[in-house]
Amino acid sequence: RVCESQSHGFKGACTGDHNCALVCRNEGFSGGNCRGFRRRCFCTLKC
């Protein structure tokens, strides 16, 4: 199962999954991607 949480450290519009994933890894997650109408960065973690 994969859990998701919105990134606390990512600032601005999420335009690229790569940058989002890097920020998420710094927050202790396994990765992340941009999602939603407002293009927010969501971090993923196996749970």
Swiss-Prot record:
Pfam families: Gamma-thionin. Disulfide bonds join C3-C47, C14-C34, C20-C41, C24-C43. GO terms for biological process: defense response to fungus; killing of cells of another organism. The record marks K11 as: Interaction with trypsin. SUPFAM superfamilies: Scorpion toxin-like. Transmembrane segments: none annotated. InterPro entries: Defensin_plant, Scorpion_toxin-like, Scorpion_toxin-like_sf. SMART domains: Knot1. Inhibits trypsin but not chymotrypsin. This is Defensin-like protein 1. Keywords: Antimicrobial, Disulfide bond, Fungicide, Plant defense. Monomer and homodimer. Belongs to the DEFL family. Protease inhibitor I18 (RTI/MTI-2) subfamily.
